[in-house]
Amino acid sequence: MEEMRHAGQISRKLLFYFGSDNYNLSINDSMFRNCTLRADRAAALFGTMLEGVFLGIVLTMMGFFSVKTRFTPSSNIWLFAGCVAIALWLMTKMAQDYAPGPLKCIVTENLALFCSLLGGALNVGMCVDRCRAVYSRMARGSMTPAAICTYIFWAVVGSLLVIAVNALEMSRNGLHMSEGLEGGCFQAASPLAHRAKLVAKFLMYLVFVCIVSVGTALTLVKILNTNLNRKRAICVNVVLVTLPNTFIWLTAMTSAWREFSSYKMCPKIVTGNVFIYLSSVPMLVILFVYMFTGKNLKHTLRPQTRSYSSSTGSASCFAHLAGKP
């Protein structure tokens, strides 16, 4: 009862003055003080147009993977699922600019979290698939389409469970419904929960980085121990595939650590900031890098795979991962 009364006081005391540089959070907690307002309302229209262009690119790629290639090779299933996650993320960010109502933050922030979790799981799955293929003695050592779809299904289920718990926590005391939060969303219902989520976010991305780093290192070791003539070029392409994801995760870890160390709990700017609209660029770069390196690997391996037996060498596995049916 005491906690509910305190939560109600927080909700009533939260004030926001338009035209100022800071949120005026009249709450007796140092974590709420000196929160800077960085929203630029003039950027919303530009951002929506930019996100519309990005969404068109992603939808075109989805059509290419599904209609043009018919998900052949099976690695295109990974890329199609990644496109779906990015498309949903873009539509979520567009909705954050215009969606009304007190539940906007609960719905859109958890959809964005879902896309982030699913995207990370997909990239980890692709890395494991790639590593598994190069260490297999079979010509088709990569995951089957059924196995990939099963992995994606459980990744979706796991991500949904996480955002369900997060949504319940965010909405438990009404802080998300405070007046005047246009342009910002609280990520938690209390300072303690906020710090716990930052730690969880840091650890989650750390796990992603560790799995992908180990998987990539094992893949590179295996490639370098083969008799392929252009194995160094293949290794460069494999590294290029993993670098964008690793950079994004390391950036997210740094951001979470800095926010945790600041002892602040400020509303997260979700609209009216040009950097938010440009944040989808790295994800598009990742997709193009996958497509480019796959094509590059295919041309690199084509003249070499004919001289290897599919039962004794891994060259066929490399070619399959590169996009060769």
Curated annotation (Swiss-Prot):
Top-level lineage group: Viruses
Membrane topology of this protein: Multi-pass membrane protein
Annotated GO MF terms: G protein-coupled receptor activity
Localization per record: Host membrane
Main location: host cell
Transmembrane segments: 45-65, 71-91, 106-126, 145-165, 198-218, 233-253, 274-294
SUPFAM superfamilies assigned: Family A G protein-coupled receptor-like
Keywords from the UniProt entry: G-protein coupled receptor, Host membrane, Membrane, Receptor, Transducer, Transmembrane, Transmembrane helix
Cellular component aspect of the GO annotation: host cell membrane; membrane
Keyword Membrane: yes
Family as reported in the entry's similarity comment: Belongs to the G-protein coupled receptor 1 family.
The protein, known as: G-protein coupled receptor E6
This protein's encoding gene: E6
